[in-house]
Design a protein with these regions (language model features):
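Mid-domain, small-residue-enriched loop/turn segments at the edges of structured enzyme/sensor domains
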Residues: 55-62, 92-130, 139, 143-146
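Thr-Gly-centered strand-to-loop micro-motif
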Residues: 87-88, 118, 205-207
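A generic secondary-structure signal for well-formed alpha-helical elements
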Residues: 29, 33-38, 50, 92, ...
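Conserved catalytic neighborhood of penicillin-recognizing serine enzymes
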Residues: 36-97, 113, 141, 152-183
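Cysteine/selenocysteine-centered motifs that mediate thiol-based redox chemistry or coordinate metal-sulfur cofactors
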Residues: 28-32, 38-41, 269-274
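Short active-site loop at a secondary-structure junction
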Residues: 5-25, 39-42, 67-71, 115
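A penicillin-recognizing enzyme superfamily signal
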Residues: 1-14, 22, 75, 79, ...
Length: 336
């Protein structure tokens, strides 16, 4: 042992491929373009090949070795489908996605390769925490710090490091992304988190697993806590573990001990909730089996009604919309 050696701080210094932890940046970039993408927009999870001059073809496979055809955008994220994410990322533009990653707080060179979309980029756990902090705080980026001030022996401050906050994303697409990341926990790759936390503790998160299962990640946040877990070997050996089997249980145990506040997303003014018929993806009603309330940016929800939605549902919805408009008008008038 060398007493002068302070050890290796993996949280700060271990840069590792992040895998699917980068996918929220793809979906955030898409959701910001509400004219083209919503949480229910069909995304193709069929076989995908990316051709690049002077390089072998790149064809990502899904974790389950299957392709799933057209799936809603929120399902593609919840189930962490690689082909869907790669196709969507190249469709909207790799550079645009990387710009989103930078705005989330990653300050390091990134090459605009298609494989980068699926996390072929090395970040430290602290850098990942910076990304997810921006999402968790509603699009406000605040540089993470461990020191608030330096004081004298008597407690007089010598240097202060004040909190710096910058809004880098509109609240609406961030809200949609966070809602979709709750689906990751409710019904997606992180649903085993229910073994560690009671159902009333709402969580948003994302699993991550890299090639040959060398790195396992879980990033998640509640109403008052955000944590990142990485599991792997320093020598880059294959751990043969996934984000959901290795990193998630550690995250869950830790959060259970901390008794966190549930995540309660504050709905921005530019978001509306609409009942959607899951069979058709059209505007549904209470008479549609399994109709689900889905958030949309104002004006982006489907206008066509599903066959299962009768005239009574349409009338009720019209009344509700009128009441909501009147409420918004009164709030603006009286400043409440």
């Amino acid at each position: 042992r060398d007493p002068r050696y302070r050890g290796y701080n993996r949280a700060l210094d271990a840069s590792r491929p992040v895998g699917s932890l980068l996918k929220p940046a793809i979906y955030l970039t898409a959701l910001a373009d509400s004219a083209r993408y919503t949480l229910i927009t069909p995304i193709d999870d069929g076989p995908f090949v990316w051709k690049s001059r002077g390089a072998p073809d790149w064809q990502p496979a899904n974790y389950d070795k299957k392709f799933h055809g057209l799936v809603p955008l929120r399902t593609a994220l919840a189930q962490s489908y690689n082909a869907a994410a790669a196709r969507l990322g190249t469709e909207i533009g790799i550079e645009r996605v990387l710009d989103t990653v930078r705005r989330l707080g990653v300050d390091r060179p990134m090459r605009p390769f298609a494989s980068t979309l699926l996390g072929a980029i090395e970040l430290s756990p602290l850098e990942v925490a910076q990304m997810y902090q921006t999402i968790a705080s509603g699009g406000f980026r605040s540089p993470l710090r461990a020191i608030r001030e330096v004081t004298t022996q008597e407690g007089r401050p010598l240097t202060r490091y004040p909190l710096a906050v910058e809004q880098v994303f509109a609240p609406e697409p961030i809200y949609l992304l966070a809602a979709a990341m709750q689906d990751v926990v409710r019904e997606g790759t992180a649903q085993s988190l229910s073994k560690f936390l009671p159902p009333e503790i709402a969580v948003a998160g994302k699993t991550g697993t890299t090639d040959e299962q060398r790195d396992a990640w879980f990033a998640g946040f509640t109403g008052d806590r955000l944590a990142i877990v990485w599991v792997g070997y320093d020598d880059n050996r294959a751990a043969r573990l996934s984000g959901s089997s290795a990193a998630l249980p550690i995250w869950g145990d830790m959060m259970a001990a901390l008794a966190p506040e549930p995540l309660a997303l504050a709905k921005p003014e530019g978001i509306e909730l609409v009942l959607i018929d899951p069979q058709t993806g059209l505007r549904g009603g209470t008479s549609c089996p399994g109709a689900t309330e889905v958030p949309f940016m104002q004006g982006s929800a489907p206008q066509e009604r599903a066959p299962c939605s009768g005239t009574m549902d349409a009338a009720v919805e019209t009344v509700e919309q009128t009441v909501q408009k009147a409420k918004s008008w009164l709030e603006r008038l009286f400043g409440r």
